C-alpha cells in the first residue's frame, strides 16, 4: 500500500507511558503512526518490546527534540515531504516535569525548558502542520473501509492546570497562573523563567505550560469550524505511575499511585489511558 492509500496520525512522546500505550490501539484502528521522539533509537526499542512485528510495520519514526525549535522546523519539513496530504491527526503527548529543580534548565533557544518542550515545541509543530492537516481529504481509508473523517488536534492535559478543578487549586507550589504574560512579552530569556515574569517555581512552570496547551486548543476551536478541525484538550484520568514522575521524590512515586487508586479513585492504567487517547 502506498502513502496515497494510507491515513497518518502523528503522536509525540512514545518511548514509554501513555504515548507508548497509544500505538497499538491506533494501529488496530487502521492508522499509520508517525512517532515523534527525541531519540529514534529509544522509541524503536520501546516499540519492539511492546508491539508485534506486524504492528511495527505501521510505525514511522521521526526524530525531533521538541525543546529545539530549529529541530521542530527541520522535522516538520521531513514530515511534509514524506507524509504531506495524508496527515489527519496530531496528538501532542510528550512532556517534561522536573519539580525538584533549583534553577531553570534552558532550551537551545534559551527558554525555560518545560515551557519549551511542553508548549513552544508543540505550538510550533501544530502551526507548521495545520495547513496540511486541514486541507486533507475528508474521506479516508481505515482497515480497508472508506469513512468520512474530520482532521483533529489533541493535546494531553492535566487537572493541575485547570483552576476549575480541585487539583488545579492546590497551592503546591502554586496554581497555574500566566499573569499578564510579562515573561513572554519581555522575551522569556535568562533571567526570565516564568510566563508571568516572577520567581522560578519548577512545579508551577509545568502547570503553566499545560495551561498554555489548553489555551492553544481553545484558540484552534475559535479559528476553525468543527467541520474543518476538531481540537481537544484530553485528560485521560490520573496515570500515576509513568516516567513523567521520574524526577519526583521516591516517596511520592510510591504513595501517589496508591492515593489515586484508593482515595481519589482517579487512577487510570497506562493501557487504558492509551486506549482513550486513540478513541479521541
Question: Where do the model's predicted regions map?
Answer:
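Rossmann-fold NAD(P)H-dependent dehydrogenase/reductase core
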Residues: 2-240
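A glycine/serine/threonine-rich, flexible loop-to-helix segment
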Residues: 169-171, 240-261
Amino acid at each position: 500500500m502506498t502513502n496515497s492509500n494510507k491515513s497518518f496520525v502523528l503522536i509525540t512522546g512514545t518511548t514509554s507511558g501513555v504515548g507508548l500505550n497509544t500505538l497499538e490501539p491506533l494501529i488496530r484502528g487502521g492508522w499509520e503512526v508517525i512517532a515523534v521522539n527525541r531519540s529514534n533509537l529509544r522509541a524503536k526499542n520501546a516499540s519492539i518490546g511492546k508491539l508485534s512485528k506486524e504492528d511495527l510495520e505501521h510505525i514511522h519514526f521521526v526524530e525531533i527534540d521538541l525543546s529545539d525549535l530549529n529541530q521542530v522546523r527541520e522535522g516538520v519539513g521531513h514530515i511534509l515531504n514524506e507524509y504531506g496530504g495524508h496527515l489527519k491527526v496530531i496528538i501532542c503527548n510528550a512532556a517534561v516535569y522536573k519539580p525538584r529543580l533549583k534553577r531553570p534548565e534552558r532550551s537551545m533557544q534559551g527558554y525555560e525548558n518545560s515551557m519549551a518542550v511542553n508548549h513552544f515545541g508543540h505550538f510550533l509543530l501544530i502551526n507548521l502542520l495545520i495547513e496540511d492537516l486541514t486541507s486533507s481529504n475528508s474521506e479516508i481509508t481505515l482497515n480497508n473501509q472508506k469513512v468520512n473523517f474530520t482532521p483533529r488536534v489533541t493535546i494531553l492535559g492535566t487537572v493541575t492546570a485547570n483552576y476549575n478543578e480541585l487539583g488545579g487549586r492546590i497551592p503546591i507550589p502554586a496554581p497555574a497562573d500566566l499573569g499578564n504574560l510579562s515573561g513572554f512579552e519581555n522575551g522569556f530569556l535568562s533571567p526570565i523563567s516564568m510566563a508571568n515574569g516572577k520567581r522560578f517555581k519548577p512545579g508551577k512552570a509545568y502547570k503553566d505550560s499545560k495551561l498554555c496547551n489548553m489555551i492553544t486548543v481553545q484558540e484552534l476551536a475559535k479559528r476553525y469550524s468543527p467541520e474543518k478541525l476538531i481540537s481537544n484538550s484530553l485528560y485521560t484520568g490520573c496515570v500515576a505511575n509513568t516516567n513523567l514522575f521520574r524526577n519526583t521524590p521516591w516517596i511520592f512515586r510510591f504513595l501517589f499511585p496508591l492515593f489515586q487508586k484508593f482515595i481519589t479513585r482517579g487512577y487510570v492504567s497506562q493501557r487504558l489511558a492509551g486506549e482513550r487517547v486513540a478513541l479521541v
